[in-house]
Amino acid sequence: MVKLDIHTLAHHLKQERLYVNSEKQLIQRLNADVLKTAEKLYRTAWIAKQQRINLDRLIITSAEASPAECCQHAKILEDTQFVDGYKQLGFQETAYGEFLSRLRENPRLIASSLVAGEKLNQENTQSVIYTVFTSLYGNCIMQEDESYLLQVLRYLIEFELKESDNPRRLLRRGTCAFSILFKLFSEGLFSAKLFLTATLHEPIMQLLVEDEDHLETDPNKLIERFSPAQQEKLFGEKGSDRFRQKVQEMVDSNEAKLVALVNKFIGYLKQNTYCFPHSLRWIVSQMYKTLSCVDRLEVGEVRAMCTDLLLACFICPAVVNPEQYGIISDAPINEVARFNLMQVGRLLQQLAMTGSEEGDPRTKSSLGKFDKSCVAAFLDVVIGGRAVETPPMSSVNLLEGLSRTVVYITYSQLITLVNFMKSVMSGDQLREDRMALDNLLANLPQAKPGKSSSLEMTPYSTPQLSPAATPANKKNRLPIATRSRSRTNVLMDLHMDHEGSAQETIQEVQPEEVLVISLGTGPQLTPGMMSENEVLNMQLSDGGQGDVPVDENKLHGPSNRSNSVSSLDLEGESVSELGAGPSGSNGVEALQLLEHEQATTQDNLDDKLRKFEIRDMMGLTDDRDISETVSETWSTDVLGSDFDPNIDEDRLQEIAGAAAENMLGSLLCLPGSGSVLLDPCTGSTISETTSEAWSVEVLPSDSEAPDLKQEERLQELESCSGLGSTSDDTDVREVSSRPSTPGLSVVSGISATSEDIPNKIEDLRSECSSDFGGKDSVTSPDMDEVTHGAHQLTSPPSQSESLLAMFDPLSSHEGGASAVVRPKVHYARPSHPPPDPPILEGAVGGNEARLPTFGSHILTPAEMEAFKQRHSYPERLVRSRSSDVVSSVRRPMSDPSWNRRPGNEERELPPAAAIGATSLVAAPHSSSSSPSKDSSRGETEERKDSDDEKSDRNRPWWRKRFVSAMPKDDPSPRLSAQAQVAEDILDKYRNAIKRTSPSEGALANYESAEVMGDGESAHDSPRDETLQNISADDLPDSASQAAHPQDSAFSYRDAKKKLRLALCSADSVAFPVLTHSTRNGLPDHTDPEDNEIVCFLKVQIAEAINLQDKNLMAQLQETMRCVCRFDNRTCRKLLASIAEDYRKRAPYIAYLTRCRQGLQTTQAHLERLLQRVLRDKEVANRYFTTVCVRLLLESKEKKIREFIQDFQKLTAADDKTAQVEDFLQFLYGAMAQDVIWQNASEEQLQDAQLAIERSVMNRIFKLAFYPNQDGDILRDQVLHEHIQRLSKVVTANHRALQIPEVYLKEAPWPSAQSEIRTISAYKTPRDKVQCILRMCSTIMNLLSLANEDSVPGADDFVPVLVFVLIKANPPCLLSTVQYISSFYASCLSGEESYWWMQFTAAVEFIKTIDDRK
């Protein structure tokens, strides 16, 4: 058989440790980045929405807000301050947070309150509507908020529109709650912006290119647009037939152009129906469904209302003002274009209403030229959707797991909202919702909350929006619920609240502070920071038992968490990863379930974390605000579910159930099973079969009492928390294994295990596991680590301390006592008896079947123990597991007898077997202490023939368990070692049972008994032999003082733990290969050769001495001391157990990888969301500037008219250029002195100057562009026709162009052609040059794409430019060149100058090409 190579094992373990450390550091950084990005996103979103509301006020220019006030307010908004709510509200913040949270989750109450407020004519109803959108629902950044708001809209349809006498008039007026909320929602919905951009960008740009004339179709209005002189010139003498004929011809021409234009819009509308926002479609279909049931409303009337909602409230506003929606960014829309856009919007609405009696009879002729059903068909598609009750949710929610935990709301908004609700309450308009509102208001303080003097109530009635969403685990499937009570979460809300500041008055120098009020919900779990043991235990629990309570899982997560923020673990993730091996779907499902749970749990967790000041331990202090706000810790951790057992728990259980089988299956085929690492047991490469064994072992860990309640566990944990200081591995393990205990996990220092050793051990695990192919080396290494981790949990202070503690056998042993509660976990892990452990739970019933893959060798006790511990993590599983868990685990194994094994196992076993079972039970406890002991104990047991031992073993395991906690000296020394271990463990369990529940202890006993029995049958003699070999003197001092059996188990676990640390820190050095005969993959214990491990450690000690590394020397020497007491066979079992554990840790590596990927995806999505919000903000600010410029120019209209008259009189180009420049400078000066611009920033002033230039040049465009009028027009027409002829004969490979063949693949460069075709839409010379630059850069990009080996030069570029110009044939080329040369030539420089030179050269070359040749 192949021998296990200690050097290979050390190499893999070191790789694992390095990899895990690296991954955890990266995950820590990613978590911090996600929190910061989320905080920035919500703050920016809050400010952006306030700016948009401020813009609406400016456009309306209502009496309450002058343009100057709006401008000052816009400046103040940029400096919005977000402060924690308690600074303003004091202790009352909690009450207000609860009020806002419950109100937010009751869409029906919100809708009925808004309707009641309108009926009562409340002045601040509109302000409250803004607050609902911006604060309560955080601008709908989170999908959860969007879903709530959609329900509010649905209830408004039912309570407001359905009850109205004339709902259509109410809707058209646009002042009802539904209209305002719909407008806010549709404006902010990103999918709506995508639809509008895809649908309207191209047709609007085409309209701007052709905006020569007003497309007026009313003859009377058409005539009025011309002066008498122009009328006579165009139409002849007024009143004559020729005049009327010419006018009609122009009307017909305009109608034809308008029909073509509208048809283009309709075509794009139909083409892009597929990307119509699902949420808007849902609202429209709900309206149609609800109002169709009203008897007094005809179907046509209902359809007309849906048309109004779609077109009048959504599409047409974007058609008329595309700049406001970001559809058109740099192309100015002049008066002619605006008029034509309004004509298009009007026709679209009329076409949608065809079939109804309405319509202007004068437009009937125009409408007759359209397809009657063109727009109606689009409407049918939107309305035709199935009216499902629940709002649509995105199939891919990249922010899944993230949840909002705070509300951003200003003080004035908060008071207004509360007063509004109170007035509604007293108004008697609420009907059935009155009780719900009464309950909400009952918890609010009667007196107004105190607020700092700095916050004065602002007269502004503008609603302020405050984001209340905090990303918990965005998008990552990491179930990271970011809901936490922490102030950080509040930050998210702050973002939304910025709108509130908009309400400030112009007199305010400082903006009203936005309060960040915690909703009091949300887990505080951090993705990727679960300890190795938690992940493995979760996997085991999920795989082994479907009915594990969700709560326990959640608890496990927290325990992990408290220890280290650095390790961001998602419990959900871990679960998914565990299953990820062969059956990843299970893992994913579990993960999703976990995510769902997490949200609910956050609150409880957060409370607990605060209670134990775990936040500081986690290192969250620095970025506390951010983390809390974002509460990025995502509900990933199962922990969350503990707190909300309802939905999440169900989901988790479903996942666990489904995953239980899938997981086990996947466990059986762990990823990496194909890795080269040899299976220590069989000597063959570790294969998926091994995973089977480990999966079985996992069950044992579940053996913890299934009945144990969380509260009891928490108590246990607290009682054991004292252990934290103890370095007992057993204690640590127990703690870690018990993570399911909520209290325990938090108190002991959640991921202490993973954190302390984890850093080293987990790292190596992950590294090794990937190589070994064992995802879960749950066995001893993990177990050790678990214990270690648990221990660390208890004492999170420093890794080194915990590591040292691990090395201190005495402390470990002693700690074990205090950790009594945790022993349960140990039982699950009695992996140290190699043969027995595998059997543990599964062994008894179907061990043989399963284990066969391992060969005769069953998992080493250490392995078993490790498995158990891992499983124990799923203690939640364990609780029900006494029979259930086992059965579920077994089921995957396909061993029907598994369920009943536990009870009968012990009875069925022969006396020796019974003893084995007992020892096994003890072993779990001691497994952490010393795997070797366990194995030795097993051998000894097998050999034992004494009646006392047999009787002791035969004794029912439950009775053994209840044996006094104090170890009893057995007359027989052999028995004493093993029996004592069992006794000790049982005693601990008894204590735990007393504290928790008898059933729990019983379960643990049964599991251990079962394991022992099975294992014993598998390896009777070896076990007994080992026990005999180990004398009381060999045991650690602490062990010798106690019972020998317990000592041997502890020694084995302890040695395995220490050996793993030694191996993972060893460097490969020259070392002679020792020859050992192996049997069934295990070293033959009869070999007399020197111990391979001891030789290896001696070399490492020599190196440590050489390097003068005192800490390493101490660790290695202690390891050597522990290992020396074992014989060769036990030592090889030790190595095999470590290797098996390594293989089984693969799920932890997968967990870390998945967490990292999830965090990276979340971060990328958050950055994209931030990009969108910043773009929205930029669009709103630029449009705001445009509106202010329009107001300025209106005040200077007289001066502008004088300028135009003077400009017409000039003939020389230089004079014209000078006059334009002088007038622009005059306007710039006037702007600087205008009160509106007093608070403008430098950027705003630059935008304003650009807007002024565009407006002025628009007014004189024709005069400047065609200085010679008809002469210039005819000249352009000649060149246009010439290019048109060339276009028919010139191809990309035409010899006159000489385009290099390598660049012909991208011909005809359509994107560059589309760029230059829009040049007519730009009216200023600067914008036209920019259009040319975009075309040139597009060509260069395409050329670079075609030939990546070289940079295209001018010789490559110019021929392509010529070809693009010929094919695009933009209008007025010559006039464009002349216009730019006259008014912008002096401003050209650098890149602009170069590309302009290339462009003019291309135009000149085109003029010389003879199309006849």
From Swiss-Prot:
Compositional bias of kind Low complexity: 883-897
Domain VPS9: 1273-1413
Keyword terms, alphabetized: Endocytosis, Endosome, GTPase activation, Guanine-nucleotide releasing factor, Membrane, Phosphoprotein
UniProt protein name: GTPase-activating protein and VPS9 domain-containing protein 1
GO MF terms held by the record: GTPase activating protein binding; GTPase activator activity; guanyl-nucleotide exchange factor activity; small GTPase binding
Binding partners and assembly: Interacts with TRIP10/CIP4. Interacts with RAB5A.
Organism: Bos taurus (Bovine)
Lineage: Eukaryota, Metazoa, Chordata, Craniata, Vertebrata
Biased composition (Basic and acidic residues): 757-768, 871-882, 934-955, 1016-1026
Places the protein is found: Membrane; Endosome
Region Disordered, residue ranges: 448-474, 540-587, 718-799, 826-852, 871-957, 1011-1049
Bilayer topology term: Peripheral membrane protein
Function: Acts both as a GTPase-activating protein (GAP) and a guanine nucleotide exchange factor (GEF), and participates in various processes such as endocytosis, insulin receptor internalization or LC2A4/GLUT4 trafficking. Acts as a GEF for the Ras-related protein RAB31 by exchanging bound GDP for free GTP, leading to regulate LC2A4/GLUT4 trafficking. In the absence of insulin, it maintains RAB31 in an active state and promotes a futile cycle between LC2A4/GLUT4 storage vesicles and early endosomes, retaining LC2A4/GLUT4 inside the cells.
GO annotations of cellular component type: cytosol; endocytic vesicle; endosome; membrane
Single biological process term from Gene Ontology: regulation of protein transport
Gene designation: GAPVD1
Pfam families: DUF5601, RasGAP, VPS9
Modified residues (Phosphotyrosine): 460
Residue ranges of every copy of the Ras-GAP domain listed in the record: 147-385
PROSITE patterns the UniProt entry points to: RAS_GTPASE_ACTIV_2, VPS9
